A protein has these predicted regions:
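Extended hydrophobic alpha-helices typical of membrane-associated regions
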Residues: 259-335
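Small-residue-rich segments of transmembrane alpha-helices in multi-pass membrane proteins
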Residues: 40, 44-48, 171-185, 233-236, ...
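Multi-pass membrane catalytic core of lipid/isoprenoid biosynthesis enzymes
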Residues: 96-137, 227-265, 306-322
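Intramembrane alpha-helical segments
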Residues: 102-192
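Helix-coil boundary and interhelical linker segments in multi-pass alpha-helical membrane proteins
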Residues: 49-69, 128-145, 180-201, 252-266, ...
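Acidic (Asp/Glu-rich) catalytic motifs at the cytosolic membrane interface
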Residues: 73-98, 208-232, 236-239
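Membrane-embedded alpha-helical segments that form the functional core of polytopic membrane enzymes
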Residues: 44-48, 56-84, 145-156, 195-213
Length: 341
C-alpha cells in the first residue's frame, strides 16, 4: 500500500518507469491508469447535482453517494477504454501528445491489453452496479434507463466514432452538464427541471474549454493522424474564437437566471473571475506560439500544451467561484425562502 503514490496520483498524472510500476499496489496502478487526477471534474458535477437537490429540499445522502461513486467509476471506465481504443488504432504512439504529457500504460508497456480490459470491466461493473441501485431507488423509471443508456453510449463511443465525427466536444458539454448534473438531479429528486439543465451549462462549458484548448494544441498532429476533432474541422482561428465565446457565455447565462429569479444575486460572485478572464483572453486572440514562451511552464500542466493549461487555470477560478456562489444561493434559499422570488 503506497499512500504517497495514492496522494500524488490524485493530484497529478505521475510518470513512472516500468520498474517503479511493478512495485506499485493495485490501487496505485488503477489511479494512474484511470488518470484519477482529472476525476475531480466528475466529483464536482455530482456535488452540483446534490446542491441543486438540497436547494429544493429533496436531497437523500445514500442515493447521492451512489450517484457520485457511479459517475466517478463511469469516467474512470471511459479513460481506460479511451486508452485501449487509441492504442489499438495506433494513435497513442510516442510522438503523440497523449504520450508526451502523461503516461499511457499500454504505449509505455506498463500494462497489457488484457490487463487494461480487466481494469475496464471491473470499473465499468462498479459503475453499472451504482446505476442499477439508482434504477431500483427510482422504481426502474423509464427516463432513468435512458440516462444510464446515454452514459454507457458516451463511455464506449466517445473516442471512436464521436471524436472522429467532430462530436467529441459536443459530447463533453452534454455529459458534464445536462447528463451528469441535470440527470443526477433527476435521479435524486425524480424531477426533470429545465432550469437546472440551463444552470449546469456554466460548469459544462468551462470543462469543454479545457478539452477544446487541448484539441487546438494538438490540431496539427490530429490533422496528420486524420483525427477529426472540431478544431480540425473548423480551423484554429475559429476554434480559438469559440473558446472565447464559451468563456464569456456563462456570465450571460447566470445573469439571465438571476433576472428570472431562479438564482439569487449571490451567484454573481463569479464576476470576481473577470480579471482572470482578461488575463487569458489575449493568448486566445493569437495562434499558438511555435516555441514555449519563456515564462510558460513545461511538462505536466504546461508545454507542449498551451491553450489547455490557460483554459484550465481560468476555469479553476471561475468554477470555484461558481460552486461557492451556488452554496451561498442554496443557504439563502433554505434560510430565507421568500428572498428574490
Amino acid at each position: 500500500m503506497n499512500l504517497a503514490m495514492w496522494r500524488k496520483a490524485l493530484q497529478v498524472i505521475p510518470n513512472v518507469s516500468r520498474q517503479e510500476w511493478e512495485k506499485l499496489d493495485v490501487v496505485s496502478k488503477w489511479l494512474i491508469s484511470t488518470r484519477a487526477a482529472v476525476l475531480v471534474m466528475t466529483l464536482i458535477s455530482a456535488m452540483l447535482a446534490g446542491l441543486f437537490a438540497i436547494r429544493d429540499n429533496l436531497f437523500q445522502p445514500l442515493p447521492w453517494l451512489a450517484l457520485a461513486f457511479g459517475l466517478i467509476m463511469a469516467h474512470a471506465s471511459n479513460n481506460l477504454f479511451n486508452d485501449y481504443t487509441d492504442y489499438v488504432r495506433g494513435v497513442d504512439q510516442k510522438n503523440y501528445y497523449r504520450a508526451m504529457y502523461g503516461p499511457q500504460p499500454l504505449v509505455d508497456g506498463l500494462m497489457t491489453r488484457r490487463q487494461n480490459l480487466t481494469y475496464f470491466v471491473i470499473t465499468a461493473s462498479l459503475a453499472l452496479a451504482s446505476g442499477l441501485y439508482l434504477a431500483w431507488y427510482n422504481s426502474f423509471d423509464t427516463l432513468l434507463w435512458i440516462l444510464i443508456g446515454l452514459g454507457a453510449f458516451f463511455i464506449l463511443f466517445y473516442t471512436w466514432p464521436l471524436k472522429q465525427m467532430a462530436l467529441g466536444e459536443v459530447a463533453v458539454v452534454i455529459v458534464w452538464g445536462p447528463l451528469m448534473i441535470g440527470g443526477g438531479y433527476y435521479v435524486l429528486t425524480h424531477n426533470w427541471d429545465w432550469n437546472v439543465v440551463w444552470a449546469t451549462l456554466p460548469y459544462a462549458l468551462g470543462v469543454t474549454t479545457v478539452i477544446f484548448g487541448k484539441h487546438i494544441d494538438k490540431l496539427e498532429i490530429d490533422y496528420r493522424e486524420n483525427i477529426r476533432t472540431l478544431p480540425v474541422l473548423i480551423g484554429e482561428k475559429f476554434a480559438r474564437q469559440m473558446v472565447i465565446g464559451m468563456m464569456i457565455l456563462p456570465y450571460f447565462l447566470l445573469v439571465y437566471l438571476v433576472a428570472t429569479k431562479y438564482f439569487t444575486p449571490l451567484i454573481l460572485i463569479v464576476l470576481i473571475a473577470i480579471p482572470r478572464l482578461r488575463q487569458v483572453l489575449p493568448a486566445f486572440l493569437k495562434p499558438k506560439p511555435a516555441t514555449r514562451p519563456q515564462d510558460f511552464p513545461e511538462g505536466q500542466g504546461g508545454w507542449p500544451l498551451y491553450f489547455a493549461p490557460l483554459a484550465f487555470g481560468y476555469n479553476r477560478s471561475f468554477g470555484t467561484l461558481f460552486v461557492l456562489g451556488l452554496i451561498a444561493d442554496v443557504l439563502i434559499r433554505l434560510l430565507l425562502p421568500a428572498f428574490w422570488r
